[in-house]
Design a protein with these regions (language model features):
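C-terminal motif of bacterial Sec signal peptides marking the signal peptidase cleavage site
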Residues: 23-24
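Short, conserved catalytic or interaction motifs in soluble domains
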Residues: 27
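Flexible, surface-exposed loop/gating regions in the mature catalytic domains
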Residues: 33-290
Length: 290
């Protein structure tokens, strides 16, 4: 007797084909990124880091020539026991950017490194970075100085790393007016007249208010941060510098824990789930959150 054909395979085949079509039409997965908010840290959409020059904490805190900076200190996390790592300027910029001075102990420019750094790590993990230097003649410029504009490469550490694309080394004029278009992390470097190196405290304070107050107001409503710090206090052994962090996730107040550039770098990295860089591996992230 001839056995009847089983109908089950003919029912199952269209179902499998349908499932295959549905799988092919699924929405594309987002690029894999490390999980943020490591160790209870908040999620932050954008960070802008501004680096000033050569002033101690006592030079700035309560100084009537710096009303805008003192306003930021009052509304943010005011790190009252914060220190640069060393002298002079250039090694501190490298410490803040890469967790190491890369063997540099002077201000002579035009170095080339291929080691890990904040920009390369952000880009490697699917985030973005931008360095905005006032007076930089053009995007990707690698010259040491521009005397007409007050630009100094020694204050621009991302220009020193071969693993950072030249396209992220931009003049301040490229800083977006639409802050939503900012990179994940940006550094803003005023020129020598506006960073307190050659100019006055008042000049720098006025410049900060003109160029960053708009971002600070926007950041409070858009889950973003401003970090304002100094490279060093100039020449003293103590090297205590002002540093203030402002944003909606920050708990305002004076913070007395002893911290330095490595703690700031560690905090930025941890906010985006990056591996700690250089000596930042030994530093704790800042505990300043609501």
């Amino acid at each position: 007797m001839r056995r009847k054909s089983a109908k089950f395979p003919f029912v199952l085949l269209p179902l499998l084909l349908l499932l295959g079509v549905l799988w092919a039409c699924r929405p594309p997965a987002e690029a894999e990124k490390p999980s943020a908010a490591r160790g209870g840290l908040p999620r932050v959409d954008h960070i802008v880091v501004v680096v000033e020059e050569n002033r101690s904490f006592d030079d700035i805190y309560g100084n009537p020539s710096a009303p805008y900076i003192n306003k930021l200190m009052a509304q943010g996390a005011n790190l009252v026991n914060h220190y640069a790592v060393e002298h002079p300027s250039q090694p501190n910029y490298l410490d803040l950017f890469s967790g190491s001075n890369q063997g540099v102990r002077d201000d002579r420019p035009n170095h080339t490194f291929r080691t890990d750094n904040l920009a390369a790590e952000l880009i490697r993990h699917g985030y973005t970075f931008g360095g905005y230097s006032e007076g930089l003649p053009k995007t990707g410029y690698t010259g040491p100085y521009n005397l007409k504009t007050g630009y100094a490469r020694k204050h621009n550490p991302w220009a020193d790393f071969a693993n950072v694309p030249g396209s992220v080394n931009m003049p301040l004029s490229a800083f977006p007016r639409d802050y939503a278009k900012l990179p994940t992390v940006s550094f803003v470097i005023p020129n020598l007249d506006h960073d307190m190196h050659d100019g006055t405290v008042k000049q720098a304070d006025d410049w900060l208010k003109e160029h960053l107050a708009g971002y600070v107001g926007w950041a409070q409503k858009h889950n973003s941060l401003l970090i304002l710090t100094w490279d060093e206090d100039d020449t003293s052994h103590r090297n205590r510098i002002p540093t203030v962090i402002v944003g909606p996730m920050v708990k305002p107040g004076d913070y007395k824990a002893k911290t330095n550039h490595y703690n700031v770098l560690r905090t930025i990295g941890d906010l985006y789930g990056l591996s700690p860089l250089g000596h930042a591996k030994e530093a704790k992230p800042l505990a300043i959150w609501r």
